A protein has these predicted regions:
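Mature-chain termini and adjacent capping regions
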Residues: 1-164
Length: 164
């Protein structure tokens, strides 16, 4: 077998074996990570502090926020209110952040949830698991209203060949 033929065979084999990886990275279904803004939000924490000067409030110590079947846990969550004082602008979670909904879970060092766009950005050693599949990177951005998202920053995935 000549070098060009062996090279073509190796390239074809690599492409065939890598196809599930490309499919997984390009078509991640974030459908499980969705929020229904009409459902009540429940927050539990060890402590709560309000800062009128910065128009914010901070929950600290084993913070757990739930809305429907979506749960966010973290060491600390700061809520920044809108400038007009009506409504929440964003939530910033830090300290071992875990976002879970159904069979989907994402963990990271920090997370920012922009309320008006329903976008969550997780940063720092992100790991997303969906069933038996896992994908990691440095940044995960998920739109909770439509379930779309992307992961960036040296993306690595683990999958079972022939499975989803």
């Amino acid at each position: 077998m000549g070098f060009p033929r062996m090279f073509r065979l190796a390239a074809l084999l690599a492409l065939v074996l890598a196809t599930p990886i490309f499919a997984q990275q390009g078509n991640i279904d974030f459908g499980g990570l969705r929020a229904d803004p009409k459902l009540p939000v429940e927050v539990t924490a060890d402590s709560f502090a309000v800062d009128q000067a910065t128009n914010s409030a901070t929950f600290s110590g084993e913070v757990r926020i739930s809305q429907g079947d979506m749960v966010i846990t973290a060491g600390e969550v700061t809520i920044e209110y809108a400038e007009d004082g009506k409504g929440i602008k964003q939530l910033i979670a830090s300290g071992g952040v875990l976002l879970k909904a159904g069979n989907d879970a994402a963990q990271a060092q920090t997370a920012t949830y922009l309320i008006d766009t329903a976008q969550v950005t997780l940063t720092g050693d992100v790991i997303l698991t969906q069933g038996s599949a896992a994908i990691s990177g440095q940044t995960l951005v998920v739109n909770l209203s439509d379930g779309t998202g992307r992961i960036e920053g040296r993306v690595t995935t683990t999958f079972l060949p022939g499975g989803n």
